[in-house]
Structure formats: C-alpha cells, structure tokens
C-alpha cells in the first residue's frame, strides 16, 4: 500500500519494511490485474495466472485455514492483511466474468463534461465491475471464516484509499479533493 516510503514495484526483503508480518505475499503498485506478480521471501517474482484479486483472496483463505488450525490448538489469534489493488485504474483489466456493468447503463455525475461522457461511462462500468469482483471475494473470505468456525470470533475491517474522480470536473484520479 506504499505507506512507508517511496519504494514501489520491487521486492521487499524480510526486515523492518515488512512491518512485523511473519508471512509475506506482496506486490507494490502492480496494476496489470491479469498479468500480475508478487514476492514472498526471495527477489524472484511469482507470476499470477488469472485475476490478481482472486489469487490474493485464495492466498488469504489458505493462510486463514492454516492459522485457524494453529489458533485452535494453541488458543492464539492471528492477523491477516489483504490489500487488493482494484478498483485502482486501469478499470478495463479484468476477466470477462466480472465485466457485469454495461457502460451504456451508467448514470454519470452531473459534473462530467459532455466531451468526457463516453470515456466516463466506460470507466464507471470498469470501476463498478472491479468493486463487484471485490464484493464476491469478500464474500468468499467471510464464507471461509464461517466454514472454519471462526467468523464469530473474527474482526473484519474493510477500508479503501480509492475514490477516483472518474471524469468529474474533467479529472481522472484523485488529484484534487
């Protein structure tokens, strides 16, 4: 999430930049969601086959399953931090199954300039399709918590740094408040 400095896109070696996490599967600023990569404990990237939000959700569920077994035996809690890249742009990069919003059906904000309307409709549809994909993945996480019998004893915190302009006032990302 690049909150600890200007380091972007590279390997984070074990140490203080991992902020105390014992298990690491991370990529900083990889926004090619169908050709993404991440790193574990060595500088060789691991390439993802498929949509990266699905893959990182799979990894988190695997981690939760492993930790739930350890926690039940040792009565120890665990923490998992999952930071999906979508709905960061590019908005059109996703599997066809997630492209569920029709650009022609998008209702634009009234402050989108007329010359930006076609592009804005495409961006809205992609943005909302990414959000739909994340909703499905959050549902998968919650189902895994229930399956593991730990949903009632788990705190799920959902937050986001997104909120792009999507052509409001002719602007694209979050350049202005």
Tell what function each PLM region has:
Residues 2-9, 64-70:
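Short regulatory "switch" loops immediately downstream of catalytic or recognition motifs
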Residues 27-55, 61-177:
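Active-site-proximal cap/lid insertion segments
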Residues 1-2, 85:
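Alpha-helix/helix-capping structural signal
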Residues 3-13, 17-28, 162-168:
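C-terminal cap/loop subdomain of S1 sulfatases and analogous C-terminal strand-loop tails that border
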Residues 4-10, 57, 152-154:
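Polar, surface-exposed loop/tail segments
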């Amino acid at each position: 999430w690049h909150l600890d400095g200007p380091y972007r896109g590279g390997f984070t070696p074990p140490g203080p930049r991992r902020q105390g996490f014992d298990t690491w599967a991370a990529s900083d600023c990889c926004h090619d969601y169908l050709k993404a990569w991440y790193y574990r404990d060595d500088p060789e990237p691991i390439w993802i086959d498929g949509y990266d939000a699905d893959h990182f959700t799979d990894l988190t569920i695997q981690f939760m399953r492993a930790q739930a077994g350890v926690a039940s035996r040792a009565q120890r809690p665990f923490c998992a931090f999952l930071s999906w890249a979508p709905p960061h742009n590019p908005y059109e990069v996703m599997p066809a199954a997630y492209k569920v919003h029709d650009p022609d059906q998008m209702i634009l904000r009234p402050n989108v300039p007329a010359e930006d309307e076609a592009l804005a409709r495409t961006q809205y549809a992609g943005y909302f399709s990414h959000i739909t994909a994340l909703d499905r993945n959050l549902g998968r996480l919650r189902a895994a918590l229930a399956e593991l019998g730990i949903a009632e004893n788990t705190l799920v915190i959902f937050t986001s740094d997104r909120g792009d302009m999507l052509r409001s006032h002719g602007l694209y990302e979050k350049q202005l408040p």
